[in-house]
């Protein structure tokens, strides 16, 4: 064989060997998925106010978590997208889940009750009520929360 024929054969073999062998290979190759910025998971639920946590799990602060419902059916589409997504929330549970709603920890397959998802949020709300306020302001805030005074009342 001549030198050009060998070169062409080598180039052909090289191009075949560097192909991506998984069925849903991302643009840029298999390793490029690690470098890609994570996007937010698809919105779902009533009024699209939640985020997908798994193929049939939709969670939002206002409604909790919906599993296997018509509102969570849209989350199955997430499996067909080539780039990974991040649902949000802090890590919780032993299965590598994320806090999805108040007191709920979800992974891609299920949701469980988790006190760590509840305690920090409640602590943050209590702390923000009193931060930087004198006692008169604190009493007014408490009365407004109880609905006993209007927010526009002056002293």
From Swiss-Prot:
Q: Which residues carry this modification: Glycine amide?
A: 28
* Record keywords, A-Z: Amidation, Cleavage on pair of basic residues, Disulfide bond, Hormone, Signal
- Entry function: Isotocin causes contraction of smooth muscles.
Query: Which residues form each disulfide bond in the chain?
Result: 20-25, 41-85, 44-58, 52-75, 59-65, 92-105, 99-117, 106-111
An example of a Pfam family matching this protein is Hormone_5
Q: How is it modified after translation?
A: Seven disulfide bonds are present in neurophysin.
Quote a single Gene Ontology cellular component term.
secretory granule
Name the family the entry cites: Belongs to the vasopressin/oxytocin family.
Matching entries from InterPro entries are given as: Neurhyp_horm (IPR000981), Neurhyp_horm_dom_sf (IPR036387), Neurohypophysial_hormone_CS (IPR022423)
Name listed for the protein in its UniProt record: Isotocin-neurophysin IT 1
Reply yes or no: does the keyword Disulfide bond apply: yes
């Amino acid at each position: 064989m001549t030198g050009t024929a060998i070169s062409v054969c080598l180039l052909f073999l090289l191009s075949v060997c560097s192909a991506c062998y998984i069925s849903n290979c991302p643009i840029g190759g298999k390793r490029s998925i690690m470098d890609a910025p994570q996007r937010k998971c698809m919105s779902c639920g009533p009024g699209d106010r939640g985020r997908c946590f798994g193929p049939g799990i939709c969670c939002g602060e206002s409604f909790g978590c919906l599993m296997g419902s018509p509102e969570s059916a849209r989350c199955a589409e997430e499996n067909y997208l080539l780039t990974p997504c991040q649902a949000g929330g802090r890590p919780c549970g032993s299965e590598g889940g994320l806090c999805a709603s108040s007191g709920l920890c979800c992974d891609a397959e299920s949701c469980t009750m988790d006190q760590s998802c509840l305690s920090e949020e409640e602590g943050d709300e209590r702390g923000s009520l009193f931060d930087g306020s004198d006692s008169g302001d604190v009493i007014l805030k408490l009365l407004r929360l109880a609905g006993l005074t209007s927010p526009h009342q002056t002293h």
